[in-house]
């Protein structure tokens, strides 16, 4: 009788272990499927378009690839023909005035319509960020703020100890639109970095 009870208990224990293993396996499959589904959705929303151009100009001008992807995603959503109410043009939403200034650095003489060309737009975004990162000591947050608000405005903020105690980085950004823009770009950069870590050149 005692042996029969022990045998029955043993069978129940084995059965419970089997059920636990099955449940764990099913949970793992569901979690994995959910992860890949979410990753696929994010990759559709944050694609690696213009990869050859971005890789080329990121390396040429010393700019992280994920930063260029994040900027393009935020600025135009990869719309080559985008034009803002302020007159910013193309994938990277560079204004004609900024384009003229950047061309004094490259020695080119292109019309503003050239910014509708993807290659030109990506190149000059990389040129601009290369200059901004150099000017602001490699600090991406400050460079992103300058891309949006302008170098003059950011330099004025850096001279304010309440905004920049060290005079080099922005502890806070007083202009709400620029603050939101910086946060949006940084979020996009972070997502690109997580989704495509192996493919991206960080510089």
Residue ranges of predicted features:
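Hydrophobic membrane-insertion alpha-helices, especially the h-region
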Residues: 18-36
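N-terminal Lys/Arg-rich, disordered targeting/topogenic segments
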Residues: 1-16
């Amino acid at each position: 009788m005692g042996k029969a009870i022990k045998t029955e208990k043993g069978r129940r224990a084995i059965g419970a272990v089997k059920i636990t293993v099955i449940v764990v396996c099913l949970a793992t499959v569901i979690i994995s499927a959910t992860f890949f589904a979410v990753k696929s959705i994010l990759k559709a929303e944050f694609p690696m378009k213009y990869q050859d151009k971005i890789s080329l100009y990121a390396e040429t001008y010393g700019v992280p690839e994920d930063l260029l992807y994040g900027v393009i995603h935020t600025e135009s959503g990869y719309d080559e023909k985008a034009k803002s109410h302020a007159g910013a043009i193309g994938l990277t939403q560079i204004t004609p005035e900024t384009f003229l200034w950047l061309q004094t650095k490259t020695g080119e003489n292109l019309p503003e319509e050239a910014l509708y060309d993807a290659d030109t737009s990506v190149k000059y975004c990389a040129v601009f960020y290369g200059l901004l990162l150099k000017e602001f000591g490699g600090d991406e947050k400050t460079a992103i703020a300058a891309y949006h608000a302008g170098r003059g405005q950011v330099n004025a903020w850096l001279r304010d100890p309440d905004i920049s105690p060290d005079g080099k980085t922005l502890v806070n950004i007083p202009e709400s639109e620029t603050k939101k823009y910086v946060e949006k770009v940084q979020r996009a950069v972070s997502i690109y970095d997580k989704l495509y870590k192996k493919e991206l050149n960080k510089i």
